[in-house]
């Protein structure tokens, strides 16, 4: 019996210290494939399926990665995001480059992220549709359509 209490006393702090992180992102969390980009100014629709461009949401981190139709790897990025009501706010963009400590994107490196549908260092999208299969978001210039993988 004494041995049982010693094990319990030793293991209790370990069990109490564990914390499960949860997310309130609902259907947003997961792996999304960018399928279409609509340019609102001229109503041009660009099919992105062959580009293999992906957005991956988890907790408050967004990962952008993909490859072009010629299988060329795209630059990978990490961003912070906030989903509040029907607004998706993106900020704090970092280029994945471990040798350079994942530098923050600035005006000179911003064009590298354009293929992902992001044109500003701080971007705001209105969420037009979001469920466990499809997401449509829009800002002042673009409408982005995704399917969930």
Please describe what each predicted stretch is:
Residues 6-9:
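Sec-dependent N-terminal signal peptides
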Residues 38-45, 49, 61-130:
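Contiguous, well-ordered beta-strand patches that form the walls/edges
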Residues 1-4:
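Positively charged n-region of N-terminal signal peptides that target proteins for export
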Residues 29-31, 59-63, 130-136:
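Short, hydrophobic/aromatic-rich segments at coil-to-beta transitions
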